[in-house]
């Protein structure tokens, strides 16, 4: 089926979203145009406002509408802990754990094949933040448990050696409520390697 230029433009724009392929983009576009024009206009307005008004926190680099995000602006947070994550969504995930320290958001992970080296993801800015803040006693590396995430954590840990900081890595393993037979071998290996004695 051949679409008009404006419909084609809408479909192509929707395909830029993660996980949205050609067919899904077509369904979304036609749904908005045929059945939910007011929803489409709200979406366009919200998207336009977000693109104009949302930037990056000057301290941790997460997404925010203000100069400082709510976490960096909160004076009650623990200034001795710094959690390093790969992206803004990770901040929201870590917040759900009750973590009350500070954050630094990388722009992804090291991936030489994709041209993402230390500068591209913000490692020099991370080191500068640690140096300037001066109050951190522990840096928690909460990068994803992928090959690239592990490499990124290892690289940062090496850079922080001899800086007088505790450098820790979040644990990876069997999810709470998970069944061992359903857990992949790599995750199970991490669980065994990170096992701890039971305190009675």
UniProtKB/Swiss-Prot annotation:
Its biological purpose: May play a role in DNA repair. It seems to be involved in an RecBC-independent recombinational process of DNA repair. It may act with RecF and RecO.
Family label: Belongs to the RecR family.
BP GO annotations: DNA recombination; DNA repair
Protein name: Recombination protein RecR
Gene3D superfamilies to which the protein is assigned, alphabetical: 3.40.1360.10, 6.10.250.240, RecR Domain 1
Name of encoding gene: recR
GO molecular function: DNA binding; zinc ion binding
Intrachain disulfide bonds: none
Tagged with keyword Lipid metabolism: no
CDD domains with a match to the protein in the record: TOPRIM_recR
Zinc finger (C4-type): 57-72
Xref: SMART domains: TOPRIM
SUPFAM superfamilies attached to this UniProt entry: Recombination protein RecR
UniProtKB keywords: DNA damage, DNA recombination, DNA repair, Metal-binding, Zinc, Zinc-finger
């Amino acid at each position: 089926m051949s679409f008009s230029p404006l419909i084609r433009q809408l479909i192509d724009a929707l395909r830029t979203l993660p996980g949205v392929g050609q067919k899904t983009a077509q369904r979304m576009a036609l749904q908005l145009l045929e059945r939910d024009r007011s929803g489409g206009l709200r979406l366009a307005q919200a998207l336009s406002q977000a693109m104009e008004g949302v930037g990056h926190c000057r301290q941790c680099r997460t997404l925010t509408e203000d100069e400082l995000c709510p976490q960096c602006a909160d004076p009650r947070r623990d200034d001795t802990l710094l959690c390093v994550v790969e992206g803004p969504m990770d901040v929201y995930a870590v917040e759900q754990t009750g973590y009350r320290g500070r954050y630094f958001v990388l722009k992804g992970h090291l991936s030489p094949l994709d041209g993402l080296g230390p500068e591209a993801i913000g490692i020099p800015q991370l080191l500068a933040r640690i140096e300037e803040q001066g109050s951190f006693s522990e840096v928690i590396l909460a990068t994803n448990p992928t090959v690239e995430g592990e490499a990124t954590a290892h690289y940062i840990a090496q850079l922080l050696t001899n800086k007088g900081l505790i450098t820790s890595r979040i644990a990876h393993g069997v999810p709470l409520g998970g069944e061992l037979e359903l857990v992949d071998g790599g995750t199970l290996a991490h669980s065994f390697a990170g096992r701890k004695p039971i305190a009675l």
